[in-house]
Amino acid sequence: MKHPTKLLFVFVALFLPTILSAQSGSEIYAEANKISAEADKQLNAAYDQLIKSIRADNEKDRAELLVGRLKESQRAWLKYRDAQVAFVGIHANIGSASSRTLGMASYSAELTKERIKDLTTVPNPF
């Protein structure tokens, strides 16, 4: 993603006024949590499926090595995603706290969708 701050600005400019006019702060936080939870649910499903595929398609020692590397990669990616979202949220510094929270949740979901694509397009055989 070349310009994450621009993505956040575009989201805020296009969608947030409508959302904010119809929702209170607590409703906005609930929507942000819903966006994040759904993206994480899809990410976990893709991750679990990849682990199953690795274990099914490889002998035990190789499978465990690959699964270990995948877990290491996933932990690092999660740290990156969370740090990137925090950076963009602070850098953007637009709107109210609730609007930033919703924008950051949407940006996090976009990063998560990219990771899901990465996990579902790993070449097979491993």
Language model features: what each stretch is:
Residues 20-126:
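N-terminal alpha-helical modules
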Residues 15-19:
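N-terminal signal peptide c-region/cleavage motif recognized by signal peptidases
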Residues 1-9:
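Bacterial N-terminal signal peptides that target proteins for export
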